[in-house]
Design a protein with these regions (language model features):
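Short acidic/polar capping segments at secondary-structure boundaries
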Residues: 112-116, 142-146, 161, 168-170
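Alpha-helical scaffolds flanking conserved acidic
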Residues: 104-106, 150-152, 179-183
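Active-site recognition of the HExxH zinc-binding catalytic motif
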Residues: 153-166
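N-terminal low-structure segments adjacent to metalloprotease catalytic domains
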Residues: 1-67, 71-77
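Short pre-active-site segment immediately N-terminal to the catalytic Zn-binding motif
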Residues: 139-155
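Post-HEXXH active-site segment of zinc metalloproteases
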Residues: 165-184
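Flexible, glycine- and charge-enriched loops at secondary-structure boundaries
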Residues: 75, 79, 149, 178
């Protein structure tokens, strides 16, 4: 399995260095490798809207706070730790089930979160993630002890969703899903 943890933190630094008017298109470009995550949306999603809808950092208003958060994520070696967490999860899952079908390629987007969003920062502790579409994982993070202490576990958790609903796994039927599957999912 090829794991591609995107250089999204470096891209975020570049975004914060350009005029505000140029930022939306750069956010779209940063997120463009995730277009394949949504084949059911004709023409693909507007990646700026996806960024905003998944607690991504604001385009303007708190640049210095964003730079500080970005530096903390980089210092925490998030890219390397996400990849390590996925490798560790792969070893554990394939040891438990040698016939398990893994995605051929996994694209992971790590996005700096929005420190101005009260729900994101307080109720969900700076963590929003999604791994339910095979081949893609999205992690939106704000550096704090809850997030930084659990990077590998967060990545492994989302990878589990990826494998569970991938080829050979559970077929998700929202009209017939049982409560037990909802809980495990």
């Amino acid at each position: 399995m090829k794991i591609n943890v995107l250089e999204s933190l470096a891209a975020t630094r570049e975004i914060l260095d350009v005029p505000i008017a140029d930022r939306p298109d750069l956010i779209r470009r940063m997120r463009s490798p995730m277009d394949g995550m949504y084949p059911f949306i004709p023409g693909g999603p507007d990646q700026l809207a996806m960024h905003e809808g998944t607690f991504g950092f604001p385009v303007e208003g708190v640049d210095e706070q964003l730079r500080a958060g970005l530096e903390e994520l980089e210092d925490a070696r998030v890219r390397e730790r996400v990849e390590a967490g996925i490798h560790q999860a792969t070893r554990a899952l394939t040891a438990a089930d040698p016939d398990l079908v893994l995605p051929e390629e996994l694209t992971v987007l790590v996005t700096l979160g929005d420190p101005t969003d009260t729900h994101f920062m307080e109720e969900i502790h700076g963590l929003s993630a999604f791994g339910g579409i095979p081949g893609f994982i999205e992690l939106t993070l704000w550096p704090n002890h809850v997030v930084c202490d659990r990077i590998e576990a967060i990545a492994a958790h989302e990878f589990h969703h990826n494998v569970r609903y991938g080829q050979g796994g559970i077929v998700w039927d929202p009209m017939a899903v049982a409560l037990g599957e909802q809980i495990v999912a």
